[in-house]
């Protein structure tokens, strides 16, 4: 059974030897050479330092295209025209599935046709030197954003290539993405990723790690999301990671979102070791977007307002073309500017929201209950407890494609749009918390004159793309 135990240097080296060879040579990811490259980078390209010294909310988009020059130009555009403080490199789907041969074919077609035949940057195929070229040619810190359950080779290549932040984790890049891996396997894979990050950190190169807070991106209750990213932060800390950015996906109700990010920061400070610097990220709305770009800007603006009120360390922005596919560089930059405009205007105001403290207390109590259940299931071992808690359903997520989660929890919005649980499954929440959730949902049912049912959930899933927050009867 998996244990929350730090890999030894010998184990780290053995895994690196095992995963390299076919697509990347062992020599290409030479650790001493990689550390020297990181040390050559100027301070403004050091991701953790920029995060941890930020005096205002930082903005970061999502972006990635297959050809290296085009990818660099895209990032430069987002920096210069969008004002991005931090830059992404979003990895293509084939690489996420470890299908490097297919990624190579897509990259070759992209070069032949002068077009994008992949939906991201195939970092493994570009290799360490290709990654270093990206880092050299842009003028801001760059993060690897992907969705890879087995990210070991991707981490080895991109970290040797000069990237200093790596998104994801064994839960957040398993349960929402795939049915191919059990949780114990991905925890083992990510122990390598985190230990590699820890090894760099011990040599003076701080690598930031960021659990993916939005999970399935669909009505995820804040307490569940926060418990899971906290677990991933704890697993990373065991392996020597010292910079952790806890992530949360906006649900759309201002009070609940502000309360959730504050709760996440408080829980992170409470549970993670003092040796770890904890920062936070708010992901703008991850659900369906309106097709009308003006309305899409409205969704982005609300997220910007949320970020202004709660002041996470950074906000991951969206574009007004989310509903139609991969956004253009111009659209992506527009989403950054919309967010920045709202942040700047609200920075000059003092706004207090009623009910935040009460909601934050409810969220924190729920998170502690979930984490207690994990520790109890693992007899104090967070890795073992995570596997057992998901097996038992005491920790769960809604709408998982993975068999590693029961998927027995069902969320719905209450009468002012906060995400509650309609079905609890076996999730480890106390009776009083369940009563609060049910009472809030009953109030909505009374308002709408209908029974609590899955129809309400389905209406909520499509509400934002239809121009509302709550899926009321007759809105279509």
Curated annotation (Swiss-Prot):
InterPro entries: Cbl-dep_enz_cat (IPR016176), Glu_mut_E (IPR006396), Glu_mut_E_C_dom_sf (IPR014714). Pfam families: Met_asp_mut_E (PF06368). GO terms for biological process: anaerobic glutamate catabolic process; glutamate catabolic process via L-citramalate. It catalyses: (2S,3S)-3-methyl-L-aspartate = L-glutamate. Adenosylcob(III)alamin binds at residues 64, 119, 176, 289, 318, 322. Keywords: Cobalamin, Cobalt, Isomerase. L-glutamate binds at residues 62, 96, 145-146, 167, 173, 177. Pathway: Amino-acid degradation; L-glutamate degradation via mesaconate pathway; acetate and pyruvate from L-glutamate: step 1/4. Its cofactor is adenosylcob(III)alamin. Its EC number is 5.4.99.1. It is an enzyme of class 5 (isomerase). GO terms for molecular function: cobalamin binding; methylaspartate mutase activity. Catalyzes the carbon skeleton rearrangement of L-glutamate to L-threo-3-methylaspartate ((2S,3S)-3-methylaspartate). Heterotetramer composed of 2 epsilon subunits (GlmE) and 2 sigma subunits (GlmS). GlmE exists as a homodimer and GlmS as a monomer. Belongs to the methylaspartate mutase GlmE subunit family. This is Glutamate mutase epsilon subunit.
């Amino acid at each position: 059974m998996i244990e929350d135990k730090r890999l030894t240097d010998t184990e780290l080296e053995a895994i690196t030897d095992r995963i390299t060879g076919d697509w990347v040579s062992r020599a290409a990811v030479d650790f001493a050479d990689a550390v020297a490259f990181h040390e050559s980078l100027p301070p403004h390209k050091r991701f953790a330092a920029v995060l941890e010294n930020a005096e205002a909310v930082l903005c970061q988009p999502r972006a990635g295209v297959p050809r290296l020059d085009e990818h660099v130009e895209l990032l430069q555009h987002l920096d210069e025209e969008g004002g991005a403080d931090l830059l992404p490199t979003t990895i293509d789907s084939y690489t996420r599935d470890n299908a490097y041969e297919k990624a190579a074919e897509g990259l070759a077609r992209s070069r032949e046709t002068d077009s994008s035949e992949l939906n991201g940057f195939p970092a493994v195929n570009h290799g360490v030197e290709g990654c270093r070229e990206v880092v050299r040619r842009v003028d801001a810190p760059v993060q690897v954003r992907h969705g890879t359950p087995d990210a070991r080779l991707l981490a080895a290549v991109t970290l040797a290539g000069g990237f200093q932040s790596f998104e994801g984790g064994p839960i957040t890049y398993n349960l929402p993405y795939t049915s191919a891996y059990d949780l114990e396997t991905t925890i083992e894979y990510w122990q390598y990723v985190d230990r590699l990050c820890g090894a760099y950190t011990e040599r003076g190169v701080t690598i930031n790690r960021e659990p993916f807070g939005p999970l399935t991106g669909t009505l995820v209750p804040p307490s569940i999301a926060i418990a899971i990213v906290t677990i991933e932060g704890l697993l990373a800390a065991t392996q020597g990671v010292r910079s952790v950015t806890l992530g949360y996906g906006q649900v759309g109700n201002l009070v609940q979102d502000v309360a959730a990010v504050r709760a996440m920061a408080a829980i992170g400070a409470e549970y993670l070791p003092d040796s770890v610097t904890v920062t936070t990220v708010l992901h703008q709305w991850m659900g369906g977007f309106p097709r009308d770009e003006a309305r899409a800007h409205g969704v982005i603006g609300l997220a910007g307002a949320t970020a202004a009120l709660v002041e996470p360390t950074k906000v991951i922005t969206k574009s007004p073309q989310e509903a139609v596919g991969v956004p253009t560089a111009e659209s992506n930059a527009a989403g950054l500017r919309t967010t920045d405009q709202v942040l700047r205007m609200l920075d000059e105001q003092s706004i207090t929201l009623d009910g935040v403290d009460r909601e934050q207390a409810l969220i924190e109590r729920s998170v502690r209950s979930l984490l207690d259940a994990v520790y109890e299931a693992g007899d104090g071992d967070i890795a073992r407890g995570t596997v057992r808690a998901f097996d038992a359903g005491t920790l769960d997520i809604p709408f998982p494609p993975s068999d590693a989660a029961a998927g027995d929890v069902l969320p719905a919005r209450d009468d002012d749009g906060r995400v509650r649980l309609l079905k609890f499954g076996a999730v480890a929440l106390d009776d009083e918390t369940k009563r609060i959730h049910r009472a809030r949902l009953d109030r909505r049912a009374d308002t709408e004159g209908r029974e609590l049912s899955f129809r309400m959930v389905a209406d909520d899933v499509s509400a934002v793309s239809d121009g509302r927050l709550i899926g009321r009867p007759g809105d279509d």
